[in-house]
From Swiss-Prot:
Belongs to the N4BP3 family. The keyword Metal-binding does not apply. This is Nedd4 binding protein 3. The lineage of its organism: Eukaryota, Metazoa, Chordata, Craniata, Vertebrata. Residues 173-234, 327-359, 422-456 are annotated as: Disordered. GO terms for cellular component: axon; cytoplasmic vesicle; dendrite. The keyword Coiled coil applies. The modification Phosphoserine is found at residue 172. Plays a positive role in the antiviral innate immune signaling pathway. Mechanistically, interacts with MAVS and functions as a positive regulator to promote 'Lys-63'-linked polyubiquitination of MAVS and thus strengthens the interaction between MAVS and TRAF2. Also plays a role in axon and dendrite arborization during cranial nerve development. May also be important for neural crest migration and early development of other anterior structures including eye, brain and cranial cartilage. Keywords: Cell projection, Coiled coil, Cytoplasmic vesicle, Developmental protein, Neurogenesis, Phosphoprotein. Residues 295-523 form a coiled coil. Residues 178-207 have a biased composition (Low complexity). InterPro entries: N4BP3. Binds NEDD4. Interacts with 14-3-3 proteins. Interacts with MAVS.
Length: 537
């Protein structure tokens, strides 16, 4: 064991002289925490942190004065008194206490970095709630465990309280105790979580950060102070606050966002900062864990897909077997022969019998021809309907022209009668011309002028009547030509329909013959049945 001289010139003793073993022996710690390590929750999972009862049993361990009297001689110096003489503010953890220079100078992390990402509900129990139940608030000290150890209501006695404060303070100086926010976040992640949620990823990594902080703190101390702390560094580590358990999928999904937040918070610090290196290492570990979880999930999904594919193939095979069975039953009910097996030796084909495939091909070809003829028949019927509509319109026009011609003939007859009456009146007026006076001559001249006008009107009417007759004759001739044309078209369409009907009958007979041949080909040949020859198509 290493020894060092104190300020009073007294040599350092063993570790047992500095610690009160009746309070903090490793066997008693293991016995007090034995129930919390191997305990399980009602659902079969491991409990992730210490309960309230285990924690108080950890703080209030029973004293064993007999073992202390046997192990430590009475002539040993009182190192507690010497420690408080040398460090008058070692156990002062009040609100106004400030850390001494050189003893607490180490790289700190901001309190907002390691806050728990998920807040818990009713079961939240932190170190501050345990220590401040009397209304006293904890200030930013070197850890909530230190404050709990030095709190008057929780300490069993003044001497034990001083020894516990001395031990915890020395351990915090040697191991680099975390910040209050760091300790609170770790304790909140350990004690305040419900059984359903996993441990916080930051509380599981605080041991590495504290270890680095303690190394930096030891480097900044003086050789005089590093002696007793080197002795205390050989002590066994306290039990872990919770047992390790695999992180859940939700926590693993939150890890990249947490890493980004830590990078932003620590961006103003130096790259060579050990905390930054530790956090980067934790980030790499988290990413590898995330990839592993993703690979496992993909493997599981692939296995499920493979199993479902095998099940579907099995169901498809069963459906095919059922379909074959149903076909056989249907064929047996219809009285047809079963399908020839392809696995057996091929039967010799009859050279005189027509192949079934050729007969089927001919049937398909004739069916196509029938459909083409049907299409042509529909087109001819549509054209015939159009021609009939045109004939009806021409007949209507002819009827109108005939009525107009009759009206013109009646007008012409009336004009002829008027001209004849005028011609009969003219000689009567010319006979007594000798005895007429000048007045009569003048009247005769007027009548002659009126007769000339009537003759001109009659000639004009004759010319118009002649034109109308010629026009009527021309229309009648044109109508007769159209009638003859439509009669020829009608005869042609009727002849075409008769031909199509005859072709339909021929096609029907051919189809009947082909069906008979197919029926003969499908039936097994017998010795007594005559062979049917196919008719020529």
């Amino acid at each position: 064991m290493a020894t060092a001289s104190g300020p009073a010139g007294i040599a350092m003793g063993s570790v047992g002289s500095l610690l009160e073993r009746q309070d903090f022996s490793p066997e008693e710690l293991r016995a007090a925490l034995a129930g919390s390590r191997g305990s399980r929750q009602p659902d079969g999972l491991l409990r992730k942190g210490l309960g309230q009862r285990e924690f108080f049993s950890y703080l209030h361990l029973p004293k064993k004065d007999g073992k202390t009297a046997k192990r430590a001689p009475r002539n040993e110096p009182d190192y507690t008194t010497l420690y408080y003489r040398e460090h008058p503010r070692a156990g002062d953890f009040s609100k106004t206490s400030l850390p001494e220079r050189g003893r607490f100078d180490k790289c700190r992390i901001r309190p907002s970095v390691f806050k728990p990402p998920v807040s818990t509900g009713k079961g939240f129990l932190s170190m501050q709630s345990l220590a401040a139940h009397k209304g006293q608030k904890l200030w930013r000290s070197n850890g909530s465990l230190h404050t709990l150890a030095c709190h008057p209501p929780l300490s069993p006695g003044p001497r034990a309280s001083q020894a516990r404060a001395q031990l915890l303070h020395a351990l915090s100086l040697d191991e680099g105790g975390p910040e209050p926010s760091l300790s609170d976040s770790s304790s909140g992640g350990s004690f305040g979580r419900s059984p359903g949620t996993g441990p916080s990823p930051f509380s599981s990594s605080l041991g590495h950060i504290n270890h680095l902080g303690g190394s930096l703190d030891r480097a900044s101390r003086s050789p005089k102070e590093s002696g007793p702390l080197a002795v205390l560094s050989c002590l066994p580590e306290p039990p872990p606050p919770y047992e390790f358990s695999c992180p859940t999928t939700e926590e693993v999904a939150v890890l990249p966002d947490t890493c980004e937040e830590l990078k932003r918070d620590l961006g103003d610090q130096d790259v060579s900062n050990p905390f930054t290196q530790v956090l980067e290492e934790r980030q790499r570990l988290w990413l590898s864990e995330l990839k592993r979880l993703y690979v496992d999930r993909l493997h599981e999904v692939a296995q499920k897909a493979e199993r479902s594919e095998r099940n579907l193939q099995l169901q498809l095979f069963m459906a095919q077997q059922e379909q074959r069975r149903l076909r056989k039953e249907l064929r047996a009910q219809q009285g047809l022969a079963p399908e020839p097996r392809t696995s057996g030796p091929p039967m010799e084909a009859d050279p005189n019998a027509r192949p079934e495939e050729e007969a089927r091909w001919e049937v398909c070809q004739k069916t196509a021809e029938i459909s083409l003829l049907k299409q042509q028949l529909r087109e001819a019927q549509a054209e015939l309907a159009q021609k009939l509509a045109e004939i009806f319109s021409l007949k209507t026009q002819l009827r109108g022209s005939r009525a107009q011609a009759q009206a013109q003939d009646a007008e012409l007859a009336r004009l002829r009668e008027a001209v004849r009456s005028l011609q009969e009146q003219a000689p009567r007026e010319e006979a007594p011309g000798s005895c007429e006076t000048d007045d009569c001559k003048s009247r005769g001249l007027l009548g002659e002028a009126g007769g000339n006008e009537a003759r001109e009107g009659a000639e004009q009417l004759r010319a118009e009547l002649l034109q109308e007759r010629l026009r009527g004759q021309e229309q009648a001739l044109r109508f007769e030509q159209e009638r003859q044309t439509w009669q020829e078209e009608k005869e042609r369409v009727l002849r075409y329909q008769r031909e199509i009907q005859g072709s339909y009958m021929d096609m029907y007979r051919r189809n009947q013959a082909l069906e008979q041949e197919l029926r003969v080909l499908r039936e097994p040949p017998t010795s007594w049945s005559p062979r049917l020859e196919s008719s020529k198509i």
